[in-house]
């Protein structure tokens, strides 16, 4: 701003006339200056006001800038370096994902091309392949090739990939649509950002325009102008900084948008990857659903097969019930026959009395005619009984034919079930077709079974009709008994009228004293010769019947009746009896005779009614589990369990009706065979060693005439005194017979004991059998109804068939003995020898033996069979049964190898010797029989599956697995080859502690070299004292827990798997584990302290585990006593074992330790334990699946 000074006008050169004008001009100048100053002051005031406004606006702009800065700082992250690093990482991941996507697309294109090519090929060659498959199936219907599976799998693969392609296309289309929508949204967002930026530029221009200050053309003071200039510079700086901040804000917003775009792409990639993972998961779920569907189909098919099998078993049970009912009908018929015979005898007695009275009083021809009519009626009744008996035999024949047809259908069902199982394993994709075929077959079988059931119903109706006929016979016999009563009354009347003819009759002895009865023939000379002969024949017949009646009819009422009959015969046959009582008066004699006749009539009536009621109510008695009084006659025919108690199955408690009504089959155990070999003759011993022969075991009916005939056949020379002694023995020991009967009924639920009395009665040593029947300790033998029915009409034919069986069994043993003596390798054995070996040594079931007999012709074929061939040809579907057969084959191949000397095992079970040494042993110590065969020299011959199931498993405390072990026929030979899968799947041993317990039990057997006698001996020695805990059973551990004062907790050890070998060998088993098993509470510190103290004492006294010196007090295994000794020199036997070990297979281990001696000094060289090597410890990995 510049100051404008007023212009000074130069005056006139004239001077004075112009002075007044100059003063006026100065005043005017001063007025103008004052006006100008006022204007300047007003302009200054306005400028100051504008400056204040601009300053206020500047403050507002600064405040707005600060707000924007704070907003920017809050919106943007603090660390730009980490943000950029994460951005670079996201970009790298994005590139990797893009590369993976490109690779997957390439692979997908390649697979699409390959699938299209395969589809073209399959569609081109499908018809020819189907024709070849059809031809191949027509040629070999048993096996089906896998081309059908390949075709169906390829078709399913094509369809699956087409479905996947369609899904991928749909997802790609949806992703593209989403990308277009997102791009449109992004374009809209960009437009909004540009519009906002333009709006910000307009606001900046307005601010800049408003910030300029126009200065008037007036001059200002220097201070004011300087301040204004400084304010303008400051405003320019602030505007510049504001523009810079806005530029930075724009750059930051661009970076933020870029980052948001990168984040969106990363999110899209993540979504795509999640979609891929979800797609894979859905595919996996679909595959699992398909798998579950297939498993459900397989389970439904198995359920249908099981239902068919249950139907077959129900039909078998129905068949057994029908047979049982038929046996009951036979027993009822026999009782009827017996009672008819007794009635006939009583009638003959009455006829004898009548003849005597006729001799004394010849004036009674009418009575004789009436008696003749009664005799004719009785003969007609006997003829009717004969017709009924023939009808029953015909019904029995028809029932046996139906049983054979049922057996054949059962065999067909088993074969078809096995075929179905094979097809299920091979063709899992064709289950529907197999299901329809199996349904058709099952419907056919159902129709056949329904027809068989209808036939059986007709048989039942016929049996019911025969039962009605028998009841009619009973009524007829009742009428006959009433007629006999009438006859007796008439006889009494005749006696009353014929008093003078009975003067010579003396008083008779008491009715029950049969020992004082004597026969006097003094008065028989007066009778006619025919009458005398008839009387003598009748007396001989009654004398013959007296003994069997005494032996068979055990009840006191039958005894009294038989004695009464004998006394009555004596009384009426003789005119005088031994006695000195003198003649009685005639009325008293007549009264006494009348009373005795009435008593005998009452006894006959009670016998008839009680016999019929017992026969009719036999089923009810059996359902109640009670044994009628007439069943006491079963003492000779009852079967107690064997002395060892190992063959009787241990069953849970069931109802008496189930124990009596259910019947099954059971194989003869080796202990029972040994017991019979000791007791019976050599011929019967050879016969009783027949292995796995099964027979239906039924409850024996009451004694019948067949029993009488068998007893006559068994001991014809038995005197009356011996019969009385047998009767006294039976009466004195009823508890033993009842207990044996009860044990028989309990054991007969599933398995029956093979009856052999039919064979025993046909042998020469009958006196020995009679001794057996008397001796209660040796047990009794059960007579089945089938053998009764076979022995009664055709005893010679039965003996002939039994001799044939004996001859066949002896021939089988002879074949095995010849093969052993000749030292023939197993590959050179012929078919009969192999079948005999399977039947007598291995103990395979009869079904497998029959299949081997049909398919295996030599030992070479048997040893060359693979696992699949064993399953397919022989039909052994159980894997453990196949393992049993493979181990037996491997054992025989090794033992009969031509390079090694043939070996056998002595009765001790520990030493393997050659045949020459065995013969020397046999010559030095003769056995009780000439059985040099393999029955007693077998490896593990005394540790068969019955010993494992009945003795060994309960001794380990694992009796709950007995049925599974028995079903899989697990013997000691198989124990070391059981895998975890076998234990879990086949033997249902899921508990790991139970498997551990079983493993330590097997280790105990290894340490004893699988010697059963040694095991039993050591258990017996350690039964009453704390030593040799290794062989303790579960019961001994329970007894020990009870003895230390923990009786309340001892019951928890049952079925727990705790035994001595587990305590002695398991390092991890301590007192805390035992307390946990005993379920001793942790609060009961006293009981736990007692357990700890006694457990440590038990380990110190009875095991090799010792306590460490440390604080933890953990028991450790001390070196075994076997490690402390050197093996002694084996001389010849050690050389033999080493030579035989060279010829055995690679996996076959031989124990080279013989009997060990204690060393002279402790510091000896430590040798390995003997239990790590034993003869049958080899693993047959080649045979395993």
UniProtKB/Swiss-Prot annotation:
<feature type="compositionally biased region" description="Basic and acidic residues">
    <location>
        <begin position="684"/>
        <end position="695"/>
    </location>
</feature>
<dbReference type="GO" id="GO:0045202">
    <property type="term" value="C:synapse"/>
</dbReference>
<keyword id="KW-0677">Repeat</keyword>
<protein>
    <recommendedName>
        <fullName>Liprin-alpha-4</fullName>
    </recommendedName>
</protein>
<dbReference type="InterPro" id="IPR029515">
    <property type="entry name" value="Liprin"/>
</dbReference>
<dbReference type="InterPro" id="IPR037621">
    <property type="entry name" value="Liprin-alpha_SAM_rpt_2"/>
</dbReference>
<feature type="modified residue" description="Phosphoserine">
    <location>
        <position position="681"/>
    </location>
</feature>
<feature type="domain" description="SAM 2">
    <location>
        <begin position="944"/>
        <end position="1008"/>
    </location>
</feature>
<keyword id="KW-0175">Coiled coil</keyword>
<feature type="domain" description="SAM 3">
    <location>
        <begin position="1032"/>
        <end position="1101"/>
    </location>
</feature>
<comment type="function">
    <text>May regulate the disassembly of focal adhesions. May localize receptor-like tyrosine phosphatases type 2A at specific sites on the plasma membrane, possibly regulating their interaction with the extracellular environment and their association with substrates.</text>
</comment>
<dbReference type="GO" id="GO:0005829">
    <property type="term" value="C:cytosol"/>
</dbReference>
<dbReference type="GO" id="GO:0009986">
    <property type="term" value="C:cell surface"/>
</dbReference>
<dbReference type="Pfam" id="PF00536">
    <property type="entry name" value="SAM_1"/>
</dbReference>
<feature type="coiled-coil region">
    <location>
        <begin position="24"/>
        <end position="123"/>
    </location>
</feature>
<feature type="modified residue" description="Phosphoserine">
    <location>
        <position position="640"/>
    </location>
</feature>
<feature type="region of interest" description="Disordered">
    <location>
        <begin position="638"/>
        <end position="709"/>
    </location>
</feature>
<keyword id="KW-0597">Phosphoprotein</keyword>
<feature type="region of interest" description="Disordered">
    <location>
        <begin position="721"/>
        <end position="757"/>
    </location>
</feature>
<feature type="compositionally biased region" description="Low complexity">
    <location>
        <begin position="729"/>
        <end position="742"/>
    </location>
</feature>
<dbReference type="GO" id="GO:0050808">
    <property type="term" value="P:synapse organization"/>
</dbReference>
<dbReference type="InterPro" id="IPR037620">
    <property type="entry name" value="Liprin-alpha_SAM_rpt_1"/>
</dbReference>
<comment type="similarity">
    <text>Belongs to the liprin family. Liprin-alpha subfamily.</text>
</comment>
<dbReference type="GO" id="GO:0048786">
    <property type="term" value="C:presynaptic active zone"/>
</dbReference>
<dbReference type="InterPro" id="IPR001660">
    <property type="entry name" value="SAM"/>
</dbReference>
<dbReference type="InterPro" id="IPR013761">
    <property type="entry name" value="SAM/pointed_sf"/>
</dbReference>
<comment type="subunit">
    <text>Forms homodimers and heterodimers with liprins-alpha and liprins-beta. Interacts with the second PTPase domain of PTPRD, PTPRF and PTPRS. Interacts with RIMS1 and RIMS2. Interacts with GIT1 and GIT2. Interacts with GRIP1. Interacts with KIF1A.</text>
</comment>
<keyword id="KW-0963">Cytoplasm</keyword>
<dbReference type="Pfam" id="PF07647">
    <property type="entry name" value="SAM_2"/>
</dbReference>
<dbReference type="InterPro" id="IPR037622">
    <property type="entry name" value="Liprin-alpha_SAM_rpt_3"/>
</dbReference>
<feature type="compositionally biased region" description="Polar residues">
    <location>
        <begin position="645"/>
        <end position="656"/>
    </location>
</feature>
<feature type="domain" description="SAM 1">
    <location>
        <begin position="829"/>
        <end position="895"/>
    </location>
</feature>
<feature type="coiled-coil region">
    <location>
        <begin position="165"/>
        <end position="499"/>
    </location>
</feature>
